[in-house]
């Protein structure tokens, strides 16, 4: 049958090796179960090293992959003796070659490969910026058609380190529409013949691609970290590393205790933080994100603004936080900018806004006593090296092929 099967977390129904986002019986997540229970590393650069726990048959030959290194200067500043940085971005001096500068590229490579292996339709996705850039890059490399819907706030983030190809189709939305509006429009486009939804957090190729951040850390450190820090918008990254950690626990060589998830959202838009403070499985919009669109506009790290995150679904972020006794933080713009300046001055690489939010949450955790000096900590910087990339590459802006005034626009108007 191949190297994995899909299993529904609620009813237990199993599916073969296919591109499937949902169970036919219920709304719970599907999870990949790999035939190899021990992690076998391939002699490949980048993400392809972790082939045995990725849902693809052909090897991924990209040099893009996560790196992990032990911090010295920043760790010393915080008084931590075992701080490791998981860096997804462009930093060739450290062996980091993600040319879209975001860990979303870890999702894009296996997703596009899985699609190619299971029918080869055009992929449709919504993006606040980073995901779209990653999928556009892989589309330009492979020639697989991709349709990307972005709110106006994300359009400037849609650049490539190579000239865009005809396989990349960008649809931007008019001012006043946000990421969730983009998700709704993309959902409609994905129903057209020959199209398939990229699936967001429901896509096991995305989750297991991002989970390689935890795999790389465990292999580098020799064990799973005690604590894991990341900024979240949908929470998919947090879910991904939790699932990867469970596989590592089954492997047996990397420890039995799951890392404690310490995740951050960016004020004023913090619906998952609000729900988790009350240990609620449900996000209540009128309580947790009152006047959401205004909050989204005021958020520094705009990519962290999903109004419909996979929080309460079985196998979603609520379950990940519960299983790891997790903590969530609400970070201000000022805290993020201060953390960014401190990190960049000490470590010598530029980081993107979500990484700044994650860094600020670590500073807060140290201040509040949520980590101790000698514990092993993994700070996942999910994007960085943009300034460094510009020293080596010419960047090309992707021009939209159409503009949508709202998510309910007639698809004929878009001329897809």
From Swiss-Prot:
It comes from the Archaea. Pyridoxal 5'-phosphate binds at residue 130. It holds the Pfam family PALP. It catalyses: O-phospho-L-serine + sulfite + H(+) = L-cysteate + phosphate. Gene3D superfamilies: 3.40.50.1100. GO terms for biological process: coenzyme M biosynthetic process; D-serine biosynthetic process. PANTHER family: SERINE / THREONINE RACEMASE FAMILY MEMBER (PTHR43050), SERINE RACEMASE (PTHR43050:SF1). HAMAP family: Cya_synthase. This is Cysteate synthase.
């Amino acid at each position: 049958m191949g190297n994995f099967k899909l299993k529904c977390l609620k009813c237990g129904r199993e599916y073969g090796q296919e591109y499937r986002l949902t169970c036919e019986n219920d709304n719970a997540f599907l999870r990949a179960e790999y035939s190899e229970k021990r992690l076998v590393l391939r002699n490949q650069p980048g993400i392809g090293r972790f082939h045995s726990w990725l849902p693809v048959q052909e090897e991924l030959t990209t040099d893009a992959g996560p790196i992990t290194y032990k911090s010295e200067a920043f760790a010393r500043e915080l008084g931590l003796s075992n701080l490791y940085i998981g860096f997804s971005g462009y930093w060739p001096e450290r062996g980091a070659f993600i040319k879209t500068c975001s860990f979303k590229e870890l999702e894009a490579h296996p997703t596009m490969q899985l699609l190619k292996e299971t029918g080869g339709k055009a992929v449709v996705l919504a993006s606040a910026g980073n995901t779209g850039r990653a999928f556009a890059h892989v589309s330009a490399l492979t020639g697989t058609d991709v349709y990307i819907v972005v709110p106006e706030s994300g359009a400037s983030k849609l650049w490539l380190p190579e000239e865009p190809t005809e396989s990349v189709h960008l649809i931007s939305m008019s001012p006043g529409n946000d990421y969730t509006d983009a998700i709704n429009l993309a959902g409609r486009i994905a129903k057209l013949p020959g199209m398939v939804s990229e699936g967001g957090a429901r896509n096991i190729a995305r989750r297991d691609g991002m989970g390689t951040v935890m795999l790389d850390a465990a292999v580098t450190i020799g064990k799973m970290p005690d604590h894991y820090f990341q900024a979240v918008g949908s929470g998919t990254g947090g879910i991904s590393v939790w699932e990867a950690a469970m596989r590592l626990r089954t492997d047996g060589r990397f420890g039995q205790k799951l890392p404690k998830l310490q995740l951050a959202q960016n004020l004023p838009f913090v619906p998952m933080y609000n729900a988790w403070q009350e240990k609620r499985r449900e996000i209540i919009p009128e309580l947790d994100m009152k006047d959401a669109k205004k909050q989204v506009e005021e958020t520094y790290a705009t990519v962290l603004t999903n109004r419909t995150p996979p929080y309460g679904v079985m196998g979603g972020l609520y379950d990940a936080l519960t299983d790891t006794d997790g903590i969530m933080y609400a970070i201000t713009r000022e805290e993020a900018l201060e953390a960014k300046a401190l990190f960049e001055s000490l470590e010598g690489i530029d980081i993107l806004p979500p990484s700044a939010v994650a860094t600020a949450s670590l500073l807060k955790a140290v201040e509040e006593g949520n980590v101790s000096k000698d514990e092993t900590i993994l700070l996942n910087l999910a994007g960085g090296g943009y300034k460094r990339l510009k020293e080596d590459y010419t960047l090309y802006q992707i021009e939209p092929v159409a503009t949508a005034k709202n998510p309910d626009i007639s698809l004929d108007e878009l001329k897809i």
